[in-house]
From Swiss-Prot:
Function: Multifunctional protein that plays a critical role in regulating the availability of IGFs such as IGF1 and IGF2 to their receptors and thereby regulates IGF-mediated cellular processes including proliferation, differentiation, and apoptosis in a cell-type specific manner. Functions coordinately with receptor protein tyrosine phosphatase beta/PTPRB and the IGF1 receptor to regulate IGF1-mediated signaling by stimulating the phosphorylation of PTEN leading to its inactivation and AKT1 activation.
Gene Ontology CC: extracellular region; extracellular space
The encoding gene: IGFBP2
Post-translational modification: Cleaved by MMP9 leading to release of free IGF2 from IGFBP2-IGF2 complex, which contributes to enhance the motility and the growth of astrocytes.
Residue numbers spanned by region Disordered: 125-151, 189-218
Name of the protein described by the UniProt record: Insulin-like growth factor-binding protein 2
GO biological process, one term: response to insulin
InterPro entries: Growth_fac_rcpt_cys_sf, IGFBP-2, IGFBP-like, IGFBP_1-6_chordata, Insulin_GF-bd_Cys-rich_CS, Thyroglobulin_1, Thyroglobulin_1_sf
Keyword Lyase set for record: no
């Protein structure tokens, strides 16, 4: 029987989700024996519909002179975009990092994998970041998050659901499941300790009272529901095809937990995902804003909506 990932251990879910969306890059033959999904091939029609990336300049003969490194769109898109450079922000919804770079969370982040969901990672060279250590090294250093938080951000379209790094250092699926089980126990114990309230914690005579966690915003609650839904899937045989996972709408929340004005579906089958505009507080569709495979310029419709509400308020006074 395959183990299940459910219950309070939602912190275990972002590694699986991020590696699905970012597309972990290549590894050795042993790594490819693990659970892999591949993006479907791009059709000639899809490639012909692609436009030059914003960083490309038109040459004298109409050819594009590209001053940036071109990488594939996030998800399973077929068009090219400019890769993120070393030191630039990166994450689930951003273009991939350039060759030789990976997307790492900031070393001081308490929830590194959630930070990558919000695009708060940084493109760095492999081995330069603190999170490039193996799970054992991180555990020996006393780090609380034993998964290490490392996420590859390469471009070959292979998606590894079970790993946070590539190359010969990868471990078999059996060992990773054991590591996930150990981490789940740590999270469960942490929740148990937090539920003790005013009791003495960790043997301290005068422990600080634990503050109740801040209320989850609607966007964060919706994201938690999506992660919970993924957690109830069996690993790995009932994970389902790639198209099924990409059919889930993953809300795009900002660092404050509000909805980003522009929400998009992930690219699939060589087509860009549709984008639409929502109210940052409620996530509801902004009336009159288009749903298109591109930039709907949500700020224009949101400002117009806010202006109309201001006029209505003045008339009521």
């Amino acid at each position: 029987m395959q183990p299940r990932l459910g219950g309070p251990a939602l912190l275990l879910l972002p590694p699986l989700l991020l590696l699905l969306l970012l597309g972990a890059g290549g590894g050795d033959c042993g790594a490819r024996a693990e659970v892999l999904f591949r993006c479907p091939p791009c059709t000639p029609e899809s490639l012909a519909a692609c436009k030059p990336p914003p960083g490309a300049a038109a040459g004298p003969a109409g050819d594009a002179r590209v001053p940036c490194e071109l990488v594939r769109e996030p998800g399973c898109g077929c068009c090219s975009v400019c890769a993120r450079l070393e030191g630039e922000r990166c994450g689930v919804y951003t273009p991939r990092c350039g060759q030789g770079l990976r997307c790492y969370p900031n070393p001081g982040s308490e929830l590194p994998l959630r930070a990558l969901v919000h695009g708060e990672g940084t493109c760095e060279k492999h081995g330069d970041a603190e999170y490039s250590a193996s799970p054992e090294q991180v555990a020996d250093n006393g780090e609380e998050h034993s998964e290490g938080g490392q996420v590859e951000n390469h471009v070959d379209g292979n998606v590894n659901l079970m790993g946070g790094g590539g190359g010969a250092g990868r471990k078999p699926l059996k060992f990773r499941m054991k590591e996930l089980a150990v981490f789940r126990e740590k999270v469960t114990e942490q929740h148990r300790q937090m539920g003790k309230g005013g009791k003495h914690h960790l043997g301290l005579e005068e422990p600080k009272k634990l503050r109740p966690p801040p209320a989850r915003t609607p966007c964060q609650q919706e994201l938690d529901q999506v992660l919970e839904r993924i957690s109830t899937m069996r690993l790995p045989d009932e994970r389902g095809p790639l198209e099924h996972l990409y059919s889930l709408h993953i809300p795009n929340c900002d660092k404050h937990g509000l909805y980003n004005l522009k929400q998009c579906k992930m690219s699939l089958n060589g087509q860009r995902g549709e984008c639409w505009c929502v109210n940052p507080n409620t996530g509801k569709l902004i009336q009159g804003a288009p749903t298109i495979r591109g930039d709907p310029e949500c700020h224009l419709f949101y400002n117009e909506q806010q202006g109309a509400r201001g006029v209505h308020t003045q008339r009521m006074q």
